[in-house]
């Protein structure tokens, strides 16, 4: 069972907030002392177009539109669908959150219904120890899913799941306000990126 499948179908209750067409849910994580966050939103675009903007790859579109991703680096290709990557994130929350980096094993999975998922979790890699100028954060099982909308081929339901340990000395209030806000921006910027593909 992939992390996306588990959190998508989890019966555990979530707290919920709405920002426009985007819903963000959260509850305490079972992986670490923070929260697991779930986002849901409809994006105007075919699943393959949305995936083209979302997929985690060096030199891809993601670094151009996602304000929370500064760089993707491929550390190792395990199989065609499994890689180990380093993600660099910029400072955030008016500089309170300093630049971070994350090393994850990433698995891409396609389903018969046309859904595409990206599943990731933290891992250590000998070529990428903690580095100066970055706080090493840890992604617990997380990812994104592009799900076709029945009867509406030009729309995609995007589900996102994050349970990220930012590490360092950060006030809990900063972390808990940062993630819901950044997730709504994620959906807004993704929608703009997909739209620009078809201009």
Where are these regions (language model features)?
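Eukaryotic helix-grip
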Residues: 1-199
């Amino acid at each position: 069972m992939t992390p996306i499948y588990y959190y998508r179908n989890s019966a555990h209750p979530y707290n919920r907030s709405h920002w426009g067409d985007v819903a963000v849910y959260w509850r305490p994580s079972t992986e670490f002392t923070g929260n697991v966050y779930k986002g849901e939103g409809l994006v105007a675009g075919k699943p393959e177009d949305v995936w083209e903007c979302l997929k985690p790859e060096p030199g891809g579109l993601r670094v151009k539109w996602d304000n929370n991703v500064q760089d993707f680096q491929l550390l190792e290709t395990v199989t065609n669908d499994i890689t180990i990557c380093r993600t660099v994130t910029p400072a955030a929350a008016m500089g309170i959150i300093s630049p971070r980096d994350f090393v994850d094993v990433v698995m891409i999975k396609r389903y018969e219904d046309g859904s595409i998922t990206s599943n990731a979790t933290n891992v250590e890699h000998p070529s990428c120890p903690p580095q100066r100028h970055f706080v090493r954060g840890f992604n617990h099982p997380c990812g994104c899913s592009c799900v076709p909308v029945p009867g509406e081929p030009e729309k995609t339901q995007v589900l996102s799941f994050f349970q990220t340990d930012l590490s360092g000395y950060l006030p809990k209030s900063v972390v808990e306000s940062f993630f819901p806000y950044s997730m709504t921006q994620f959906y807004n910027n993704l929608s703009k990126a997909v739209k620009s593909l078809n201009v």
